[in-house]
């Protein structure tokens, strides 16, 4: 057994330590790249467990990498040296406090953007920046570590622009609070309480410490919503339109798809429609033999989308 794995196995519950070969292979890669193999995946459930893990790794000189929902495609949580320990934060996903009077919410770093949004929706509030397209799985800690953009970015900027405070376990295993939360008996309502230490731990991919909690501001949910889409033959006019709309603060989100991505999305939509049609036709046939014959006939005819349609730039 690896020396650091032996050490942490004596300090932490066995159920949060994973050395299964398949899990090691999975967690040693992100959506795009494969990194050096890690030696263990640890899924802490409390701040104390995170601190114990960090101290054990410090004693052994073992690198630590931190992972949220695993949606990174930029090597954000990949190890840079073999036999590192990966900390999977998704077990720490509690919504700690919602303060409607002072307009903030405190969450554990492993909470997904979708979970937070759905929890706040009945209260009529949301965070100004409220996650990525992958927010069903992507975590708040991961979004802050990679300084993600998407929902709300049209008016409120990036994830890092919308943080009041973070609670961080440092490289020595100490717990550090930033912003007004660093003061005893003070609420985490203000980021700029002295030097902006909060900013140190945003966009760092977890390199400067393990974020265990974050406090985000709250704003009212809009009373009405509207959506529109535009097609462009070239990227230049689309980008200029996006820039002008952003300058006028006319939308909370604006994003575009290039021809390649748009074509992939159209293929997926076409395949989904074909599958639905296949299911409907087959269900109408009587007898298993007829079902097989009709299904094979449709399958052999190929998908309705063959890439012949000209695809341009699309702005939503």
Question: Residues of each region from the PLM?
Answer:
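N-terminal flexible segment immediately upstream of the FAD-binding catalytic core
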Residues: 1-55, 71-103, 262-269
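Short, glycine/charge-rich beta-strand/loop segments that flank catalytic centers
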Residues: 67-76, 131-140, 258-261
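FAD-binding subdomain of flavoenzyme oxidoreductases
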Residues: 94-98, 108-109, 113-250
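C-terminal substrate-recognition/cap domain of FAD-linked oxidoreductases
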Residues: 239-316
């Amino acid at each position: 057994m690896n020396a650091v794995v032996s050490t942490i196995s004596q300090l932490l519950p066995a159920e949060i330590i994973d050395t299964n070969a398949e899990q090691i292979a999975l967690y040693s890669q992100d959506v795009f790249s494969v990194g050096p193999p890690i030696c263990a995946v640890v899924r802490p459930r409390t701040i104390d467990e995170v601190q114990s893990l960090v101290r054990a790794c410090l004693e052994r000189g073992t690198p630590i990498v931190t992972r949220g929902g695993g949606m990174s495609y930029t090597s954000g949580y990949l190890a840079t040296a073999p036999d590192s320990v990966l900390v999977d934060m998704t077990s720490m996903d509690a919504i700690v406090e919602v303060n409607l009077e002072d307009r903030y919410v405190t969450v554990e770093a492993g909470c997904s953007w979708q979970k937070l949004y759905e929890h706040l929706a009945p209260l009529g509030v949301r965070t100004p920046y409220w996650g990525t397209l992958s927010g069903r799985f992507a975590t708040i800690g991961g979004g802050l570590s990679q300084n993600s953009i998407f929902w709300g970015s049209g008016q409120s900027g990036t994830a890092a622009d919308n943080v009041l405070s973070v609670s961080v376990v440092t490289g020595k295993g100490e717990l550090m609070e930033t912003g007004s939360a660093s003061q005893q008996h003070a609420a985490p309502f203000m980021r700029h309480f002295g030097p902006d230490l909060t900013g140190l731990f945003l966009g760092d991919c977890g390199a400067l410490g393990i974020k265990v909690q974050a406090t985000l501001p709250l704003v009212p949910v809009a009373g009405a919503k509207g959506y529109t889409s535009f097609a462009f033959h070239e990227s230049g006019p689309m980008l200029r339109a996006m820039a002008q709309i952003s300058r006028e603060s006319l939308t909370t989100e604006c994003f575009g798809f290039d021809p390649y991505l748009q074509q992939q999305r159209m293929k997926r939509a076409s395949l989904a429609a074909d599958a639905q049609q296949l299911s409907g036709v087959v269900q109408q046939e009587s007898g298993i033999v007829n079902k097989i014959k009709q299904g094979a006939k449709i399958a052999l005819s190929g998908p309705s989308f063959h890439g012949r349609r000209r695809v341009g730039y699309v702005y939503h």
